[in-house]
């Protein structure tokens, strides 16, 4: 996961300068640049998505509200198959609970460099914080029980690492199994990073973000049975953010569908 983060970040870092110079921007400027955007996140401990609304404070600063959700992976999770039998499914031995998070935050964004021309890059930094909830549910496994020398019975049970070695596991049970046993742990988090906004359109947002998140929960999140679990989690992230700039004079461009519209070429005569 860390290798993928490094490759993703370095690729974005190398690609963005290509857009640093371009044509003079003749598009109509939007003075009150309030923004709405979505993001896909790749974290060092999982992946997720977020929705953000940013309100203009002044020429260089914005205040934003954000909702984010994603999964939480333990660094010792490894996918494997039964070492002795050919089974169709895989599992992560030692994992007793699957965990996801839900966060809500208030933050601030400051613009360091504005776009000089069409195709330029605006550089900003941001920070935020707020409450976070970790939801976890037990993981059920399909476990092999011998009936005779050549026959086995499969039962869906929670993992007991003392009674169930890896060669007793057929595969993981369906994800919905154990959903009614979900538990929640509250906490707080802070987040910070940099934003490179490179859209060529005044009313559309395309950006790469990178930074860190530090989360603290009231108790450890019990993900693995055989490895220490933690209540304080530090993760790095990179994300792709896309959205629209709110234009009060042209409401039609405030919809997310505007991002996917393509300008029709005007034939030359």
Show the residue positions of the predicted features.
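Residues that define the transmembrane beta-barrel architecture of outer-membrane proteins
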Residues: 32-36, 43-47, 61-63, 98-102, ...
């Amino acid at each position: 996961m860390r290798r993928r983060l490094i490759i993703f970040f370095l690729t974005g870092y190398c690609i963005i300068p290509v857009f640093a110079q371009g044509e003079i921007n003749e598009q109509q400027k939007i003075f009150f640049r309030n923004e709405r955007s979505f993001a896909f996140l790749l974290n060092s401990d999982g992946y997720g998505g977020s929705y953000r609304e940013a309100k203009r404070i002044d020429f260089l600063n914005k205040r934003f509200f954000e909702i984010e959700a994603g999964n939480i992976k333990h660094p010792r999770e490894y996918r494997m198959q039964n070492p002795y039998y050919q089974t169709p499914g895989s599992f992560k031995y030692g994992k007793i609970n699957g965990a996801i998070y839900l966060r809500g935050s208030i933050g601030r964004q400051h613009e360091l460099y504005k776009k000089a021309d069409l195709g330029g890059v605006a550089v900003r930094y941001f920070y935020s914080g707020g409450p976070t909830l970790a939801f976890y549910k037990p993981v059920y496994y399909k476990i092999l029980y011998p009936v005779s020398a050549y026959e086995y019975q499969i039962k869906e049970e929670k993992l007991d690492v003392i009674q169930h070695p890896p060669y007793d596991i057929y595969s993981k049970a369906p994800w919905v199994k154990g959903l009614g046993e979900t538990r929640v742990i509250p906490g707080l988090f802070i987040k910070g990073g940099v934003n490179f906004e490179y859209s060529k359109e005044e009313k559309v947002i395309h950006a790469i973000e990178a930074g860190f998140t530090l989360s603290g929960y009231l108790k450890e999140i019990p993900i693995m049975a055989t490895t220490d679990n933690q209540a304080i989690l530090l993760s790095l992230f990179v994300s792709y953010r896309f959205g629209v700039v709110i234009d009060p004079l042209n409401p039609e461009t405030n919809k997310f569908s505007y991002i996917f519209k393509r300008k029709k070429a005007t034939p030359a005569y």
